[in-house]
Amino acid sequence: MHGFTTNFHTHTARCKHATGTDREMVQAALDAGVQVLGIADHTPYPGAEVQYMRMAPEEAAGYFASFTALRTEFAGRIDLHIGFEAEYFPDCFDQLRRFLEDYPCEYLILGQHFSSARGEIYYGMPCDDVSVLARYVDLAIAGMETGLFAYLAHPDLCRLRGDQSPARPHYLRLCQAAKELGLPLEVNLLGFRDRRGYPSENFFHIAQEVGNTLILGADAHSPAHFADPAVLQACTDWAAQFGLPIVHEIPFRSTLRQK
């Protein structure tokens, strides 16, 4: 039996680049031995120009209704939680927060894919310009500082080609900020499985120096992503090599509404 029993990073077809029905995703996780499953699809982002990789705002109500019903149906077999993966865009983050106040969102994870709501720079590809990495780290730290996120997803998504030494000071300050704020760093199974260049030993050796806490995230975009126990175990073993604590719980809330 693999050690991958909790996962808070699961997508749905609403994000336009995942497959499978909601029920199929929950069933696949259950069949794989996952005991606690968090659904965290790419959040609608009112005001953002980049909408092709996230659900539309009008789909949010159905998202919560569907998984609320599945939570009841699967009760006693798998513990189901409903949240979102979101990005931090300073110019429209308050608008997103106000939008989410109307829904029973239990948690947010921070996954910074773009440099702005206009989608000017996509961080998922290796780059040659260290200033791109610096901006990514700036946004990730600012997002973590809002206090609304449970953890930082694929923290090493933005990465340099070739010589990694220029990346070190930026990865170092990212890891230090996460530790100071008490937020885990995700070891991303999607990147591990597809050999995307992350999770990277370079980044997590820096996390090891800093003494960060880790969390495993499937980043599942298909029910099939839960289907290979050998991959789940290999990712678990890879994360364990750094000797850092790996958490299996995150804080939940009943609403994002500010008091």
Please state what every model-predicted region is.
Residues D22-Q35, D91-C105, Y136-T146, R173-Q176, ...:
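Short amphipathic alpha-helices and their capping/turn segments at secondary-structure boundaries
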